[in-house]
Amino acid sequence: NPYIKVRYGFAGSFKNADEGKQLALNQNINGSDIIYTLAGDAGSGVIAASNEAKFLIIGSGSDQHFSEVNRVLTNTRKLYNVIVFQTVKDTLQGRFPSGKVIYDLKNGGVELSLLNKNVPEYISNRLEQIRDDIMNGWIRVGVEIPEWAKRQNQR
């Protein structure tokens, strides 16, 4: 979508809630309407910033609807139960998946939690269609990390 601008930012630590909050506030000041948060306590700082500046967030890991119901649209969840079960099953069948193994939407490794009740039905329906299109291979999901972000991770 040419009208969507994606911004990246790194707090530098999973444990720094203040840095996560400041990063989120800066992204919001620069035009971010929705912020996808990762990183433990740094993510808690993003939640605090969303209360202060009134922007929306997508949480990750655990279901963060319980922390700030009106600010959290949804959460991405890693389904460790699926990953562990599949790894044990493959190992018992003599097919231990050594090396790089990616679990994604298509193979049941991740999902979105239930959407916030304030998300309009047409958006919920569109997200379901996008999910189906990913599952059927019509939409290809990839990760392209900008050069500056690669350099940031090397510090």
Model-inferred region functions:
Residues N1-R155:
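A residue-level marker of the well-folded mature domains of exported/periplasmic proteins
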